Amino acid sequence: MKNRHEILVSFHMRELKMKEMIKDFLDELSSSSPTPGGGGASGLVGAIGCALGLMVGNLTVGKKKYKDVEDEIREIIEKLEDLKKKLVTSVDDDAENFKPLAEAYRLPKNTEEEKKHKEFVMESCLLDASLVPLQIMDLSYQSLKLFSTLNEKGSVMAISDVGVGVQCLRSALTGSI
């Protein structure tokens, strides 16, 4: 069994890793690299919104005051967990789907044949690149619908977290348009 010192050190190490991962993502996001970009940022913000909804749900479940709504909140927790995972996955998926489009922009267009080829490739790549943002939009919308129940029936101590979660999901939705 770990003693208090070992637990604190373990927590501190996890916190440092998390800060490093966030810093790395933000550094890459702010670089001149085309990915990650707005799509990946939208996916991440949506996942953060879901996480806030999950926090509200977890603060609600198991409390006497909310016993009557516990089953409904548990269902929301299950759905938000799935939506959060999909939004996290969308961060990398968006970058992968955008790479061919970024490469297509570099294709030559000196001759008519090159112009036609570039146009064809660009159209195909644009379609593929738009799929993940559309998915982010859908996942964010599905998540937002669950927040009305959290707002009405979730722990009143976490009502501000419901509001921040809603704003995150709205940003994810509009950012993916």
Predicted feature residues:
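N-terminal amphipathic/hydrophobic targeting modules at extreme N-termini
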Residues: 3-5, 9-11
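Amphipathic alpha-helical interface segments
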Residues: 94, 98-171
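Conserved phosphate/anionic-ligand binding catalytic regions in large, soluble enzymes, centered on
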Residues: 31-54, 158-176
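A structural-propensity feature for long, helix-poor, extended segments
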Residues: 64-103
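Amphipathic, well-ordered alpha-helical segments in soluble domains
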Residues: 21, 25, 48-55, 97, ...
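Transmembrane signal-anchor/signal-peptide helices with a preference for the extracytoplasmic
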Residues: 55-67
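Short, hydrophobic/aliphatic alpha-helical segments
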Residues: 17-36
